Amino acid sequence: MKTCLQLARLLQLASPTLPVGAYTYSQGLEWAVESGVIRDEASAGRWIADLMHHGIGCYEAPMVAALMTAWSAGDVDEIECLNAEFLASRESAELRAETVQMGFSMRRLLRDLRDDTLAAVATLVETQAEVAFPTVWSGIAAAWQIEPEAAVTAYLWSWAENQVMAALKAVPLGQASGQRLLAELGSRIPEAAANANTLPKSRWSNFTPAFAIACARHETQYSRLFRS
């Protein structure tokens, strides 16, 4: 990290106080609890770690890295292509609605921040009918000149933290369990972030059938705390 200001900006982007409603989504974890796949700290850790390794780390994280490169280069065509690709990649209606809603909230935040360095990002995303959350998030990170590997690290941490918070509520688990899970997941993030920044697009993959099934079945789950 080049400056303390960039670090502060990165912490702001990774903060659970970011007003995008991430805490209302479990991304299928709630159904995994309902079905008995997740039942305790150990099984929650396996579920989240497997998803980070086989899904988020192999597709969404590389997508963020590629989007940052496109934003930094001012490559509008590539940004729009990656945005459309990410929207099309969502495995269920709830997941697609999630990223669109969070993207909309980030677009609104862009206006509210009144930061001149974000003007180009705001102008482009306003032209899109639907914008995915990673598209806007990576645009802000690039505009704030945050290094890609640091940005992807923070993105993965924010995702993992949200998953752990969902597990704490849904299983439920205690605060100490949550901290142990975060410590274990945190130890895996540097490798995942480094891999995401170098993974060629031909090797991107979000082939996670159990995750897709969990997200789809959550849509008809009788009793729910979360929106996905």
From Swiss-Prot:
One MF term in the entry's GO annotations: nickel cation binding
InterPro entries the record matches: UreF, UreF_sf
Highest taxon in the source lineage: Bacteria
Recorded GO CC terms: cytoplasm
Localization of this protein: Cytoplasm
Main location: cytoplasm
Keywords assigned: Chaperone, Cytoplasm, Nickel insertion
Pfam families associated with the record: UreF
Function field: Required for maturation of urease via the functional incorporation of the urease nickel metallocenter.
Complex formation: UreD, UreF and UreG form a complex that acts as a GTP-hydrolysis-dependent molecular chaperone, activating the urease apoprotein by helping to assemble the nickel containing metallocenter of UreC. The UreE protein probably delivers the nickel.
Assigned protein family: Belongs to the UreF family.
Protein name: Urease accessory protein UreF
Organism of this sequence: Dechloromonas aromatica (strain RCB)
